[in-house]
């Protein structure tokens, strides 16, 4: 029973915050600079993998510490899990209103983060691309 009351209180709070969300979303849209993941990838460091006549990844190609690699992979997993976050928020608030617009923009932005992280890790051979996809 307490969990249900907590959910109702949270929903009421989020609904009450919608005017603030709308104001801040509009402010963000006015100052945000559009960016694209491909602009931040060092493509000139890329090489084909064995399937295309290149060389498969080897552990010697790692370029970051274990902590940095783990951090980037966990961040990527979080970005890849976005559809479930989007679904939860969109189910509650729908597509209309400030929360609906925010969740759509947030999902797109986080999707770009995921694309940039994955491309960077694979292009620079910082991680085993096969293990990354498993």
Regions from the language model: what does each represent?
Residues 1-100, 123-134:
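Terminal targeting/low-complexity segments that flank the catalytic cores of oxidoreductases
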Residues 75-83, 106-121:
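Alpha-helical transition-metal enzyme core signature, strongest for iron centers
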């Amino acid at each position: 029973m307490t969990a249900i009351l907590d959910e109702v209180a949270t929903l009421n709070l989020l609904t009450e915050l919608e005017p603030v969300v709308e104001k801040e979303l509009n402010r963000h849209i006015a100052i945000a600079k559009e960016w694209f993941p491909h602009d931040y990838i060092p493509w000139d460091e890329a090489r084909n993998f064995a399937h295309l006549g290149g060389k498969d990844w080897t552990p010697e190609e790692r370029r970051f510490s274990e902590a940095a690699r783990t951090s980037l992979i966990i961040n990527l997993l979080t970005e890849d899990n976005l559809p479930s976050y989007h679904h939860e928020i969109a189910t509650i608030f729908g597509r209309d209103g400030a929360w609906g617009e925010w969740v759509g923009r947030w999902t797109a932005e986080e999707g770009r983060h995921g694309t940039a992280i994955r491309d960077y890790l694979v292009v620079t051979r910082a991680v085993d691309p096969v293990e990354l996809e498993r």
